[in-house]
Amino acid sequence: MAFPINLTQTLLFFFCPLLHLSFAAFTPTDNYLINSGSNTNTSFFTTRSFLSDSSEPGSSFLSTDRSISISDTNPSPDSPVLYNTARVFPVGGSYKFQVTTKGTHFIRLHFAPFKASRFNLRSAKFRVLINGFSVINSFSTSSVVVKEFILKIDDPVLEISFLPFKASGFGFVNAVEVFSAPKDYIMDQGTKLVIPNSAQIFSNLSSQVLETVHRINVGGSKLTPFNDTLWRTWVVDDNYLLLRAAARRAWTTHSPNYQNGGATREIAPDNVYMTAQEMDRDNQELQARFNISWGFQVDEKRVLHLVRLHFCDIVSSSLNQLYFNVFINEYLAFKDVDLSTLTFHVLASPLYIDFVAESDRSGMLRISVGPSDLSNPARVNALLNGVEIMRILSPVSSEVVSGKRNVVWIVVGSVLGGFVFLSLFFLSVLCLCRRKNNKTRSSESTGWTPLRRFRGSSNSRTTERTVSSSGYHTLRISFAELQSGTNNFDRSLVIGVGGFGMVFRGSLKDNTKVAVKRGSPGSRQGLPEFLSEITILSKIRHRHLVSLVGYCEEQSEMILVYEYMDKGPLKSHLYGSTNPPLSWKQRLEVCIGAARGLHYLHTGSSQGIIHRDIKSTNILLDNNYVAKVADFGLSRSGPCIDETHVSTGVKGSFGYLDPEYFRRQQLTDKSDVYSFGVVLFEVLCARPAVDPLLVREQVNLAEWAIEWQRKGMLDQIVDPNIADEIKPCSLKKFAETAEKCCADYGVDRPTIGDVLWNLEHVLQLQESGPLNIPEEDYGDVTDPRTARQGLSNGSNIERDYGDGTSGIISSTQVFSQLMTNAGR
């Protein structure tokens, strides 16, 4: 029986890992451990001995005589001895190992940069190949990194090569591990390929090259190579939980009941299966049925990953009490999981389930567990014990790593082919209906048409008919012109990379500078985003919304062309780049501009548009630092007049996501307000919305900033670059506005119009102080929209902004377009 962790159990919980160290460790058939650049052997974490590669027998593995061994002359006292030396490859080099047992092997490469007399390892830039297959491209690091790869070796020799990226570069490594994996560590049977609306079988998994990205001990403490059977490291899940209130830790002191055919101690150590996160059913703020969700940044967009989930029912007092569902990226991956049946009716018996899933357009993988329809209402629960995420690298034709992914693509192609056929059929019907109703529709309201969402794939004909039938002919730009204007999409002109594809700096025939966003060639996965941006941006113009110049759909391409924003994203002027930091006044003006653009989206039609992905990288700056909201791929129409929300799947970016929208899947314009509030704190503190490398209390920017705000000490975490120039009255009002935006419930958040008015007041306070307003009163400002009774509610006004921007707005929104000249 497992118990939720409370204060009296905390010590026992954290010492739990120490109770299970006596089991016999796995003994691999092939086992090579190299201490690179050292003259002596050394141990690391355990009794495993790493051989020096500067003397026999370790030096026999080096296949080059042009490498250099270096030592850290000033090592940190906390640094392991293994990381005090390194092998440097100025012109490339490799290690070669004899493989006695063919099959799956682990390869771990340790990189711990330091500065020596001749080399600063932090400036290294190189590639790593395994038997000629590139596993690391253009690698450099300023901190300790351990890269782990799992792959099948069929040759008698394993060669690991380190190649400088350019002539001026060099490669290095501090330690190398090569050892054979336990039998059946990667299985070819039973792996589910999670795709929209179904879960197919992914074949030939053992022949793929895997790179470990995350290894999580859910609900437990950190595990090191000292207490793991395969010398792995498992980190805690606290920083990955999307809603901490939904989960509570559970644990047991009883050893897992391992069964034949289930998990083994080599798959995961005891401590993983003895702890878990389960639903916090005592939390009264949550609904009766909810999911526990984790979000994992994997960096690579639209890339397949092996997701291995570990389960052990340590929360049930008897069999057949626990039923739950598993979701990956919102798709149902496993319905009605019954651990009792899967473990042959043995309680607390470990097992794991493998899935293959694709990361989303933001480079995220989201995993959720939640109650099943089979759950007893009195025992609704779900749990998860561990997570491993491994990136599946590009298909390999090398003899060393055999196997192909043809089966996968056959499955995917079959499914998507069905979607293509259905899409063509429904589009044909749609076109006929449009011809019939064209006159009627042209006389209707000028509000935006609802955005269409497509699933699966489509070919160029489908796209052409969809876009062409929308009447956007004047926006078409030929592929030849874009190819010429970007020097054949030269990689040196890339100014950004997103989930849709790369963004290039380019120019048109008339020498107009543009930003060219090109969807991944041959892929139709971005079709909904492609259509959404054209639908929205072709119908509106506003000074603070990025303008669409045109699009291209020739040769199965999906290319969007925008006005060029010289200064790039707001984020690059706050942190993480060499750009000079913006002043406090500039930051306020940027926030005000973005709020104006967002307010126009929310109020520019009867339904309005909800952006759904407001963040600092989607607010761009032109040459004069004028802010413009960009990237409308996730946007959709707001609720109808008689509705309060739009029910839809959760979309957005980790760290900016409205918690209420996440819990209820009910989208409103207040979801954008929450995201904008996070941006306000980002502007003030100059740090990311989520930073998993920080201590737990600081990981989430909004939570951390609000905590300091409520203590009256927000000035202590303000960006040092602007701390001396912010007036206290300006900071106070700005912080109050940001805090209200980030309220847990949408009803407690202001409208974006209120936010806009308050930000303009913040700027006035910064430039002139509170003037005649008593200090205790300047925290609340009345929005002038409350004094609109003199305007007719039924009329529409077409506004000309003098700078070429225009749009249809109702008279009830006219005040949102007024410019406040004071303080400009």
Curated annotation (Swiss-Prot):
Stretches of the chain found on the membrane's Cytoplasmic side: 428-824
Entry's Gene Ontology molecular function annotations: ATP binding; protein serine/threonine kinase activity
EC number annotated for this UniProt entry: 2.7.11.-
Extracellular side: 25-406
CDD domains, sorted: STKc_IRAK
Protein's membrane topology: Single-pass type I membrane protein
Pfam families listed in its UniProt record: Malectin_like, PK_Tyr_Ser-Thr
Signal peptide: 1-24
Glycosylation, residue list: N6, N41, N204, N227, N291
InterPro entries linked: Kinase-like_dom_sf, Malectin-like_Carb-bd_dom, Prot_kinase_dom, Protein_kinase_ATP_BS, Ser-Thr/Tyr_kinase_cat_dom, Ser/Thr_kinase_AS
GO cellular component, one term: plasma membrane
Cited Gene3D superfamilies: Galactose-binding lectin, Phosphorylase Kinase, domain 1, Transferase(Phosphotransferase) domain 1
Name by which UniProt lists this protein: Probable receptor-like protein kinase At5g24010
